[in-house]
Amino acid sequence: MAWFDDTYYFEQAQLRIAHITDCHLFSDKQGEYFGVNTAEHFTRALTDIAKQQPDALIFGGDLTQDHSFNSYLLFAELIHNSDLDCPVFWVPGNHDEIDQLNLISGGQIQRAKHIVAQGFELILINSKGNTPAGWVTPSHLEEIMACLVDSDNRHIAFCHHNPLPINGYLDKHMLENGPQLLNLLVNNGRVDALFHGHVHNDYQQQFRELDIYATPASSVQFTKHSATWQQEDKGAAYRMLHLNAEQQKVHIRTDVVWLNE
């Protein structure tokens, strides 16, 4: 099956989307990443997200830290035990294995990478490369182009890796062909924004007329604009998107939610 073959449909022209990323789970609930219990942080974020009553949750990658299959099972357990009643979608991070993500998909956790609402669509891009850095393969770029040209709707894109430098330590692991992907999205003329994770903090950038948003991690944050790898426990975080299609435009309102504030 090609990446975008499975499509999920919403009938409405307004969506509330929760974007949560980089939970870095372990095989058990006591695992800690830089002193942070990642399962506790993720659970706390899911509890708060459920109160927002989103239409969908998009997980932005880096589910696992110890690369165990039990960490994937823990992710599914925490989702299923939460108060969330919406579908959950995902993109793979550099820590993740797509086959393992597919194994926990089914029911509430969806495999679909193409989400269609009235007047706009969401595309979930695979930026996982052979190294911690990101790479969108030539064949996947063709799939993205085909998905975009197949519809006159507005589009919003999601991937894991940052496509532009953030002037920080993780730039060495950014999306290596980020400008190529961004030019494809901008040149299409119907893509309004791209959302990503990976950098463990919130950023807002622009490439030509495309808005780019980084969502902070649900686990631990990496200090902004630091050439060395510095961590901060600022509490669990996620992003909410309020999307509204009107007169061949999609209006985007987005806010980061910091649970320690």
Curated annotation (Swiss-Prot):
InterPro entries: Calcineurin-like_PHP_ApaH (IPR004843), CNP_phosphodiesterase-III (IPR050884), Metallo-depent_PP-like (IPR029052). AMP binds at H24, D62, N94, H95, H200. It comes from the Bacteria. PANTHER family: CYCLIC NUCLEOTIDE PHOSPHODIESTERASE CBUA0032-RELATED, PHOSPHOHYDROLASE. One of its GO terms (molecular function) is metal ion binding. This is Probable cyclic nucleotide phosphodiesterase PSM_A2567. Keywords: Hydrolase, Iron, Metal-binding, Nucleotide-binding. Its cofactor is Fe(2+). Fe cation 1 binds at D22, H24, D62, H200. The keyword ATP-binding does not apply. Binds 2 Fe(2+) ions per subunit. Transmembrane segments: none annotated. It is an enzyme of class 3 (hydrolase). Fe cation 2 binds at D62, N94, H160, H198. It comes from Pseudoalteromonas sp. (strain SM9913). Its EC number is 3.1.4.-.
